[in-house]
Amino acid sequence: MSDAHYDMHKRNGYSSDEPYPEIKVLGPNKYYAELLMDDYAGISSEFTSVNQYLYHNFDLDETHRELSEMWINISITEMLHMEILAKTIRLLGGNPVYRGSTSSCGAYWNGGFVCYGNSICNRLKLDLHLEHVAINNYYKDISLIEDPYIKAILNRIILDEKLHVSLFEKAIEKYCK
């Protein structure tokens, strides 16, 4: 699969305009692969984000089409991040099964990682928090990884996550007065 595939699947308004870097690594590194497993399918991961945002969308009624569109498009962007991370983990010599690393003590992903929430406002705040945690986790990984290609990948994903923060903040401003 070419790296142009990633840009082709970007969601207008839900992904940064910056192109994704080429998905490559300096060489196999199981330690880096394990670090990325938490971003991929750990507790506060892309896999959790996808499922949390989809659930929040599924539980909406027809009167909130704008929120529904936002949650669906952000979840699709998070799926793209999962695909990018899976490819990177494979290149590093890892196996991108649905499990975390240190965040979940290596346990497989489960629906208990999702914060389901009980109202639109509560859900938006939970989603905003999840994006902040993801950004912090990516920055932590960048500080531990010495591979410039992986750093470029993570920095590019962070651009999308920061856009998601902005979208959730705007939605909170609109729906949580």
Tell what function each PLM region has.
Residues M1-K177:
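Non-heme di-metal
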